[in-house]
């Protein structure tokens, strides 16, 4: 499909720079592609009223790390050069894949010093991607990164304001526990203890999977056709216990409600052709565009995404391209707040 089919104009004033407070007071656009009322404006705290007892919410429990590192390139016979690296996927106890800027100033064999944390450029790939081999390893490396790193705010926020101490709380879900993400699973940012309590009272199950969201989630689609786009890889895990529990939900007639596109991509990666979920522990590069047949997820809660992004393609596959174009036009016109710190939506899958 042509990538420009997924384009739309978004005014700057619709881009959220801070989250709603309280989190569950964010606006909530209900999208029913096959319903008599296609669009409905609500608030996130009303989520339980759109679900049924026996449904299951699936959350991504990854935890954002301060993966933005500022350093100096050291090369024999050359001047020290400032570089910025965003870690995006751990590949060994002492090794991370990262996106470096400016990438053209870095080559294999360079050493980068991040304020006392040293790394060797073990490999150099395309589009500024490098493999960093650190002098520290395991928990020692984790502590060192936490000490020198910064929260890697999305480019559309970082371009408008610097990171501050509030972001370390705001850009983290209340249930985050598995360290390794470069970006937050942002649909989950709307959940509060009060909303969890309301969901419990409504008989809605909660289950957790882990997908370590990488910096590739912010990469623009440069191809003109979706067939030519290469999707980034992210490491994910679905336990045998979670797969079994979700299969039981489906067997009882309950619905799988994915909190965020990261949970959805992982569940669809772990699903067999008949829709049964299997244990999963691997990297996924699943790229979902219109025409994809969803196997596991029935309902999707998700924020509002960038024009021509892989995530707007995903929601268009889930609820229909024309439905989502209408939903986004309504959201823009009525002042919904977009992107990571913005408002949310609840999409019911289009099956016709």
Curated annotation (Swiss-Prot):
What Gene3D superfamilies does this protein's entry cite?
Answer: QueA-like (3.40.1780.10)
Please provide an example of a Pfam family that matches this protein in its UniProt record: Queuosine_synth
Q: Which InterPro entries match?
A: QueA (IPR003699), QueA_dom1 (IPR042118), QueA_dom2 (IPR042119), QueA_sf (IPR036100)
Pathway where this protein functions: tRNA modification; tRNA-queuosine biosynthesis
Catalysed reaction, written as an equation: 7-aminomethyl-7-carbaguanosine(34) in tRNA + S-adenosyl-L-methionine = epoxyqueuosine(34) in tRNA + adenine + L-methionine + 2 H(+)
EC numbers for this chain: 2.4.99.17
Q: What is a single molecular function from GO for this protein?
A: S-adenosylmethionine:tRNA ribosyltransferase-isomerase activity
Keywords recorded for this protein, A-Z: Cytoplasm, Queuosine biosynthesis, S-adenosyl-L-methionine, Transferase
Query: Is Transferase one of the keywords?
Result: yes
Q: Where do the TM regions start and end? A: none
Query: What GO terms describe the biological role, i.e. biological process, of this protein?
Result: queuosine biosynthetic process; tRNA wobble guanine modification
**Where found, per UniProt?**
Cytoplasm
The record's Gene Ontology cellular component field reads: cytoplasm
Q: What does this protein do?
A: Transfers and isomerizes the ribose moiety from AdoMet to the 7-aminomethyl group of 7-deazaguanine (preQ1-tRNA) to give epoxyqueuosine (oQ-tRNA).
Q: How does it assemble?
A: Monomer.
What family does the entry list?
Belongs to the QueA family.
Name recorded for this polypeptide: S-adenosylmethionine:tRNA ribosyltransferase-isomerase
**Species:** Allorhizobium ampelinum (strain ATCC BAA-846 / DSM 112012 / S4)
